[in-house]
């Protein structure tokens, strides 16, 4: 019985496998991808050839990016983006060549939303803060490469913030923006 179920699952997965398209053969027309030789809207897996290897970039649904997309730059830095219906929605991250994450941003329906974090190449946090409805909000903190707080800024949505600066890790000034 288990062998029959396994065989059926293999058959179904082969039968419904998605088409694959090389991105160099596609045209991006306002966020909708078509092939260069026709206007058919695409559904399937998108790849590119990198160092003679097929590298999966992401998935198209109704011609739009959907789900996790990974792009590799010539300097071997990696960018990961999450899309829903062709719009950034979720986590977006850029990585150093070493594989260490350089920054991670969050989007909701194409708008800045949630926690944004940046790191030094040594893995220490560089700065961190949040967005709400596309605006900086709450307390943003900046650190030096050794992990010591350099400055802070408190934001309120659609209002100026208050800067707190540190010198040698000691509070030196608080500046309220007009």
PLM features: residue spans?
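Sec-dependent N-terminal signal peptides
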Residues: 4-14
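Glycine/tyrosine- and acidic-biased, solvent-exposed loop/turn segments at the edges of beta-strands
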Residues: 13-178
């Amino acid at each position: 019985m288990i062998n029959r179920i396994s065989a059926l699952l293999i058959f179904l997965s082969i039968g419904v496998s998605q088409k694959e398209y090389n991105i160099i053969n596609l045209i991006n027309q306002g966020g909708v991808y078509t092939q260069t030789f026709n206007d058919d809207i695409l559904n399937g897996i998108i790849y590119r050839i990198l160092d003679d290897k097929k590298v999966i970039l992401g998935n198209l649904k109704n011609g739009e990016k959907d789900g996790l997309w990974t792009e590799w730059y010539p300097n071997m830095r990696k960018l990961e983006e999450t899309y829903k219906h062709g719009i950034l929605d979720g986590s977006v991250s850029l990585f150093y060549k070493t594989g260490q994450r350089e920054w991670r941003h969050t989007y909701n329906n194409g708008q800045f939303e949630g926690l944004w974090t940046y790191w030094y190449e040594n893995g220490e946090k560089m700065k961190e803060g949040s967005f709400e409805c596309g605006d900086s909000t709450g307390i943003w903190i900046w650190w030096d490469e050794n992990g010591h707080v350099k400055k802070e800024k408190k934001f309120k949505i659609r209002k100026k913030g208050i800067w707190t600066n540190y010198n040698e890790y000691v509070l030196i000034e608080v500046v309220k923006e007009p």
